[in-house]
Amino acid sequence: MARSTADQHWMDRAFALAENGRWNTAPNPRVGCVIVSGDQAIAEGWHAQWGGDHAEVDALKQLDASDPRLAEATAYVSLEPCNHHGRTPPCTELLIQRGIPRVVVGMQDPDPRVAGSGIERLRGAGIEVVVLNGQTSGRWLNRRFLSSLERGRPWVVLKCAVSPDGFADPPRKHQERGSLPITSAPLRKLTHQWRAEEQAILVGAGTVAMDDPRLDVREASGPAPIPVVMDPHGRTSPSAQVYQHPQAVVWGGHNALPAHVVQLDTSDGPAIESVLKHLHHTGCRSVLVEGGPYTLNGFFQSGLWDEARWCMGPTPTGGGMPAPALPEGAILRGAHPYGEDHVRYFVNPHSADWVGHAPSPTLALPLPA
């Protein structure tokens, strides 16, 4: 296998390993590492937990420091190794100490604390460093992290459940409260896994008033996102379940809300821009929008969205609130059947241009039997 072909092969493996940390690394980037000697992987690792071992450490701790294979090994790291003391020591120093002669990096880290210094440190120690910048797979892998650093806002994912006849909210009696599901249980479980991937989850006041959702991840593993409610007219109840979250945020609201709820001033610019600005300033890298048609249309009209996941259930509702229309130019990344349901993945063309491209999606959970 030619060296360039081998480099790409092992880097693709590092990218795949990095995805193992997608639920617990935020606000850090996702990083994978493969240590290769000859044509064999001798160790693999990934950054699994914010504040925990970085990918290089996770891989190298599987090998004895005196392992002779390290003297001819190549370390494939999906993102430039860090060169600063944070919650963990610099990964550059460990690579140097272990005597690895060659390091292949998926992309340079734009974080100002790194920004090429890791590559310089390794080269200064006599290590051959190959940088595969232009690897858009690496940019897509860390699109949340990069959006915060390069665009100054969280990555925005919109999710909508749609009936086959085009409705997003089935008819219900006025006094009924609680969600009336359009999709089946397996897809709702997948939605909870999507929630765990994002740092915040946003809904409108209507969703809270009608459904009183918990917006948690009870059917999946991973951290619960910070709930954000758009409530400019103070419609939501202080006893709503979302306000039990210790970091709950509301744009608007009223004075009767629990004291711990962060209330954003409605005079501080347009609603969506104001909320995204607040989330960015608090270190939030991504937000999942599960609001109703009015809220989703607001994001479409503002242009401040990146991905849209349209989940079509199996049964027509015969009426209700029409689902939002996807903007002209939205790029279909892929479509998957999921049990009785069907999921379509779209990306904002401007977001696709910024990332470089949008790879075909993979589902976060196994397909139901």
Model-derived regions, located:
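Enzymes that bind and transform nitrogen-containing heteroaromatic metabolites
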Residues: 2-29, 87, 155-369
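Helix-turn-helix
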Residues: 32
